[in-house]
Amino acid sequence: MKIHLSLLTSLVLLSGCNAGDPVMVYESRNALQCETTGISPSESAAKLSAEDIEVTETVCGRRTGVAYPAACGMGTGTILIHKIAEADLAVAKKIGFQKVAELVDLDAGTGYEFVDCEKE
């Protein structure tokens, strides 16, 4: 009986530890109008992989609700979005990524949208 109780207690405690829940993180592409499209999706994902963070999905995006002046050398608001395990979020933040959900501010009218990535 004690073994069953210990096993049951262990299972209950471990059930709250789902390190695999996904979270979406992003970084700026650092693209400049008239000059460069910035870093590629694979280069961005490689930064996470170098920290032993598994990237399960990568998409391109664009910040919304933010004005970018139309002038060569100015930013574009394009971002790279990756799906990773929530357990890896702290490490991802240390290397410059942020949760994409933090871009959404309903009061300010800001957010993000998915866009097609150009072919690498």
Identify the meaning behind each predicted range:
Residues 82-89:
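Helix N-cap motif at beta-to-alpha junctions
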Residues 31-67:
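Surface-exposed, low-hydrophobicity interaction/linker segments
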Residues 30-35, 76-82:
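Second-shell loop/turn segments in exported
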Residues 96-120:
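C-terminal partner/receptor-binding element of secreted or periplasmic proteins
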Residues 18-20:
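Bacterial signal peptide processing site
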Residues 14-16:
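C-terminal motif of bacterial Sec signal peptides marking the signal peptidase cleavage site
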Residues 54-80, 113-120:
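Short, intrinsically disordered low-complexity segments
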